[in-house]
Amino acid sequence: MKESINILAIESSCDETSAAVVVNGREVLSNIIASQISTHEKFGGVVPEVASRKHIEVISAVVQEALDEANFTLDDIDAIGVTYGPGLVGALLVGLQYAKGLAFATGKPLIGVNHIEGHISANFIEYKDLKPPFMCLVVSGGHTFIVYMKDYGEFEVLGETRDDAAGEAFDKVARAIGLGYPGGPKIDKISKEGNEEAIKFPRANFHNDTLDFSFSGIKSAVLNYLNKREMKGEEINNADVAASFQKSVVDVLVDNTIKACISKKVDKIAVAGGVASNSCLRETLVRECKKKGIEVLIPPFILCTDNAAMIGSAAYFEYIKGRRTSLDINAVPNLKLGER
């Protein structure tokens, strides 16, 4: 095998169009991201049809910019990695069809990547010496998982949400208190002005050994609190609501992740996904893990949000295991972690 394996990666699962060139799964030569946040902000959330059209408009330019920034041509690429699920089906298809076209035209192998696996792999970019096994908390707008990474590309899901993802709950609560979209960063910001002990919102407790999550109850409790105060004409302190809600979510995420570490006897927790940029989650997880002697690894913001570099990292580890993807692959919007 060559000393350096160069992956051209493409990500388009939601509202970011991204392309990257990644060497040996850990060195990023380029990571171009065209965000659609300003487009969807006025709608209060991502509109799938609009997202697909925006991907189509920019994908060629984004891929070319990634190659140019890396000072590469397609001849320098060993394989093409692309997200094929989970995500919005129309958005996924744009990136997938583009990648399939490149693979067909160049004869380069295609490697389909699970978006969640990509988020986990972002940690290999930031932490060059990181090796499995370790625990990973994946928290984003669409996904919440506790994953035990046994080996490269080999996962065991120990806990997942039974309803809303953590990021989804953040977005809905932010909308309810008039903060708009995207909700996560806005709740994080306003919470710094509030009292996290002001309101006691419930935490889901399944009363058994499960490490699963449920955030719909917390979200509903916030909405009920707001409705009751409004009906009585009472003043609502949005900062207190945001801070108390955030603490409820973060406490559950941290508690379950530490329990998972203890159950598997691992001393490293990696964090992945857009919600990993939340300051309360970062501070609470680091503080509580320190008490247990557990190391916490959190990539920088650019690697927490959707990006193609993480897809390139995951694709590399698939490549060296000899895994290749047929050109007849289709988008799988509900793809499960570990499915191939």
UniProtKB/Swiss-Prot annotation:
Residues reported in the UniProt entry to bind Fe cation: H115, H119, D306
GO biological process: tRNA threonylcarbamoyladenosine modification
Keywords in alphabetical order: Acyltransferase, Cytoplasm, Iron, Metal-binding, Transferase, tRNA processing
Signal peptide positions on this chain: none
UniProt cross-references to Gene3D superfamilies, sorted A to Z: 3.30.420.40
Record-linked InterPro entries: ATPase_NBD (IPR043129), Gcp-like_dom (IPR000905), KAE1/TsaD (IPR017861), TsaD (IPR022450)
Gene that this polypeptide is encoded by: tsaD
Similarity section: Belongs to the KAE1 / TsaD family.
One annotated GO molecular function: N(6)-L-threonylcarbamoyladenine synthase activity
Cofactor, free-text remark: Binds 1 Fe(2+) ion per subunit.
Necessary cofactors: Fe(2+)
Enzyme class: transferase
Location in the cell: Cytoplasm
The keyword Acyltransferase is annotated on this UniProt entry: yes
Positions that bind substrate: V138, V139, S140, G141, G142, D171, G184, D188, N278
Enzymatic reactions: L-threonylcarbamoyladenylate + adenosine(37) in tRNA = N(6)-L-threonylcarbamoyladenosine(37) in tRNA + AMP + H(+)
Role description: Required for the formation of a threonylcarbamoyl group on adenosine at position 37 (t(6)A37) in tRNAs that read codons beginning with adenine. Is involved in the transfer of the threonylcarbamoyl moiety of threonylcarbamoyl-AMP (TC-AMP) to the N6 group of A37, together with TsaE and TsaB. TsaD likely plays a direct catalytic role in this reaction.
Protein name, UniProt field: tRNA N6-adenosine threonylcarbamoyltransferase
UniProt-listed Enzyme Commission number(s): 2.3.1.234
Single GO cellular component term: cytoplasm
